[in-house]
């Protein structure tokens, strides 16, 4: 994240904090220094701001604020662009809307929930990035510093480490003490769309992202690989909610496996793989009609929904959702 912050400082934040310095008049604390900032041009004020103690690039509060803004703005843009790409390019909107469990105005609701909670996730995530750029952890610069074998091994280790911890965090969020206040919001979307990918309570989203940020504090990780992985896992979150069932892979926890989680609640907690679901007896094979349209029929769908409603009542109690289908209102 230090690379991102360096470029952000150079092209955005130096000027941004310079403008803050400019806003102080001669009666402010800035004017009480040896340099009278009100007599300087913008370029000099920018330089004054970044060399003063409060707005220096290395000041911890400036770094925290900058990292929060980067995480919030870039996270929001990444979510909106990737989810919109999936939604408008290949997501089958008509088929999703025909499902009896699709909510009224669902896409709008998903988007609003995500936009409301992304700032909270960002402010909780910023301290991890702050610790990383201030030298804590094991993030390293050169690609070959630990050898290329370890470089690729660290990617596999990152995925396994994250998947293991996310599995247990996600499963814990289904405990009755945590489900209603935190995780139920994300399960409002029984038939997910790409916009549901980040539509959850900020503490829910943050807790499931913790393993990504914890990893470089336990294992060496190249900083460029870290950025690549962080971007990739965010896009993966969109992919497993996009309703595009490319393959029925027994190892990878794809969109079909995650669709089963949203539909049946207590299965397929993994993020990337099915390994820990299989080991811990929470694996459910995706419904085969997701892959073969010829298997789909109204009778089978009604059977699936009856089972889902039984599980849903056990987990949540009375259903308070408002569905788009008139017969379910």
Curated annotation (Swiss-Prot):
Chain's gene name: erg32
Cofactor: Fe cation
GO cellular component entries: endoplasmic reticulum; endoplasmic reticulum membrane; Golgi apparatus; Golgi membrane; membrane
Species classification: Eukaryota, Fungi, Dikarya, Ascomycota, Taphrinomycotina
Function according to Swiss-Prot or TrEMBL: The third module or late pathway involves the ergosterol synthesis itself through consecutive reactions that mainly occur in the endoplasmic reticulum (ER) membrane. Firstly, the squalene synthase erg9 catalyzes the condensation of 2 farnesyl pyrophosphate moieties to form squalene, which is the precursor of all steroids.
The protein's name in its UniProt record: Delta(7)-sterol 5(6)-desaturase erg32
Any single Pfam family the record assigns to this protein: FA_hydroxylase
Record's keyword terms, sorted: Endoplasmic reticulum, Golgi apparatus, Iron, Lipid biosynthesis, Lipid metabolism, Membrane, Oxidoreductase, Steroid biosynthesis, Steroid metabolism, Sterol biosynthesis, Sterol metabolism, Transmembrane, Transmembrane helix
GO molecular-function terms, A-Z: C-5 sterol desaturase activity; delta7-sterol 5(6)-desaturase activity; iron ion binding
EC number: 1.14.19.20
Cross-referenced InterPro entries: Fatty_acid_hydroxylase (IPR006694), Sterol_Desaturase_Related (IPR050307)
Sequence ranges assigned to domain Fatty acid hydroxylase in this UniProt record: 156-281
Pathway connected to this protein: Steroid metabolism; ergosterol biosynthesis
Transmembrane segments: 67-87, 149-169, 210-230
Knockout mutant characteristics: Abolishes the production of ergosterol when erg31 is also deleted. The double disruptant also leads to susceptibility to cycloheximide and to staurosporine, but does not affect tolerance to nystatin and to amphotericin B.
Record text about domains: The histidine box domains may contain the active site and/or be involved in metal ion binding.
Motif Histidine box-3 in this chain: 257-262
Biological source species: Schizosaccharomyces pombe (strain 972 / ATCC 24843) (Fission yeast)
Motif (Histidine box-2): 183-187
Membrane topology annotation: Multi-pass membrane protein
Motif Histidine box-1 positions after renumbering to this chain: 170-175
């Amino acid at each position: 994240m230090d690379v991102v912050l360096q470029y952000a400082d150079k092209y955005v934040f130096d000027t941004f904090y310079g403008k803050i310095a400019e806003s102080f008049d001669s009666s402010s604390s800035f004017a009480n220094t040896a340099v009278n900032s009100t007599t300087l041009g913008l370029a000099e004020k920018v330089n004054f701001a970044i060399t003063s103690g409060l707005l220096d690039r290395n000041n911890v509060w400036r770094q925290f604020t900058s990292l929060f803004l980067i995480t919030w703005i870039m996270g929001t843009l990444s979510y909106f662009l990737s989810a919109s790409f999936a939604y408008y390019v290949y997501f089958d909107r008509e088929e999703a809307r025909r499902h009896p469990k699709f909510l009224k105005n669902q896409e709008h609701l998903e988007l609003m929930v995500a936009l409301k909670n992304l700032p909270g996730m960002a402010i909780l995530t910023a301290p991890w990035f702050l610790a990383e750029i201030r030298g804590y952890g094991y993030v390293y610069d050169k690609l070959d510093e630990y050898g290329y074998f370890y470089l690729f091994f660290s990617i596999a280790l990152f995925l396994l480490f994250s998947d293991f911890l996310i599995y247990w965090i996600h499963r814990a969020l289904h405990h009755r003490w945590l489900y209603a206040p935190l995780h139920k919001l994300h399960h409002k979307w029984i038939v997910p769309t790409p916009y549901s990918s980040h539509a959850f309570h900020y503490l829910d989203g943050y807790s499931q992202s913790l393993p990504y940020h914890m990893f470089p504090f336990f294992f060496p990780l190249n900083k460029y690989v870290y950025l690549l992985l962080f971007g990739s896992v965010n896009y993966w979150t969109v992919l497993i909610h996009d309703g595009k069932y490319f393959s029925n892979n027994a190892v990878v926890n794809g969109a079909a496996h995650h669709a089963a989680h949203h539909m049946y609640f207590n299965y397929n907690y993994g993020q990337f793989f099915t390994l820990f679901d299989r080991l811990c007896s929470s694996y459910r094979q995706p419904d085969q009609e997701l892959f073969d349209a010829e298997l789909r029929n109204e009778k089978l769908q009604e059977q699936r929904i009856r089972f889902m409603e039984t599980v849903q009542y056990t987990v949540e109690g009375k259903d308070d959702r408002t569905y788009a289908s008139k017969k379910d209102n």
